[in-house]
Amino acid sequence: MGRKVAHALGLRNVVVEDDRRSAVVGALGSADGLVMGVGTGSFLARQVRGRVGLLGGWGFRLGDEASGADLGRKLLQRILHAVDGIAQPSDLTDTVLAELGGTPADIVTFAGGASPSDFARFAPRIVAAAQQGDAAARALMEEGAAYLMRAATALGWSAGEAL
């Protein structure tokens, strides 16, 4: 893709990168530390002595674990699991199921046409419900936090290092 951009612009010396490295520069400057970019999508980056290691940022279909979109998708999965009897329903799962039409088919229809931001719109409600003790929401938040810790550890981060 970088070559296509350089060719289209008529430039000889061009480096085209995704936004993860610029996020590291913006967050850390030249300092060492870990950046967790968690919004609609997600990535982690660790900078040590000017060298940057990257993890994630592969987009909604293949990654973005612990992101708002991931939380929303997993909430809908949790609703379907509750309907199937393999997960416990909660106030949040019952409410969202009703809002989307009340049937598993309504969940599937919504998900089939949903963008990452459509899934992510559930994230603030998941956070709020977790803070109020909703078991399903807490499980989703804990799963996301566990992923972020595994990813940070995989990059070599340790407690006490800038985050």
Task: Tell me what each language-model feature is.
Residues M1-P89:
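Phosphate-binding/catalytic loop of phosphoryl-transfer enzymes
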Residues A6-H7, V24-L34, L76-L163:
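ATP-binding/phosphotransfer module of carbohydrate and carboxylate kinases, centering on a glycine-rich
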